[in-house]
Amino acid sequence: SKDDLPKMASLRFAAATRHFAQPIRQSIDTAASIGATGVQLDVRNELKPTELSETGRRHLIRQLGEQRLELASFEYPTRRAFHDSAQLDARVAGLKGALEFAYSMGVTVVVGRVGRIPDDPDLPAYKLLCEVLNDIARHSNKVGATFAITPSSDSVEGLRGLFERITDGPLGLNLDPAGLIMSNCDPVETYRALYDRVLSVQIRDGLRDVDGQGVEVPVGRGEVVWDELLAMLEEGAFRGWLVATRSSGDDK
């Protein structure tokens, strides 16, 4: 929880409700009870735009208001990478729909994974990924909500190279300090290098075990230097949300 982190006056903390594994209305109450001021909703499995009626939407907004919670961001998870051509059109259409839904709900950021960035820009998979992300960036420009990618064992150089090739509209980064630690990357250095792309930050922790494997652990028990990272976010006047997410273990 955010109580395990140093206090930073200007930073905003949200909870990813899907990790509570509860019905959404209960999840919202749980998020409020742990001191979050915002929530991140999964708009593929938890709250499908196509299944939310106008009345349902009003009820959701009312409940959030009653609990003094804001919608921080949406998550759109996919099973396959955005450079895997199998059922790619459906994934892209789903993500575009999530961006439209986000804007209609006053949300400006949708996070998700695109798969590990291929190493060589000349590979067909790399070119396909750039084509897809430029298409999504154009859509973001049109609808007013931006896709922020959560890295998958990608280096700073790999991320920077990809961002440089997405020129048709905005593309952001969902900084995942635990994922970076588990991939042998430094979250602070990554933020320094790509700070202008960071739209959202995940609050989860990780470490490298004796075999060099990445392991997710409760916040404060891993190798993420939170004092330094949060101080840097505050100094840089970071305006996005820090979202508590824990994808494994009992102490979520």
Region locations from a protein language model:
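N-terminal pre-domain/capping segments
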Residues: 1-107, 134, 168
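Conserved H-loop
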Residues: 70, 146, 239
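Active-site acidic/histidine proton-transfer and metal-coordination neighborhood
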Residues: 23-29, 63-66, 81-173, 182
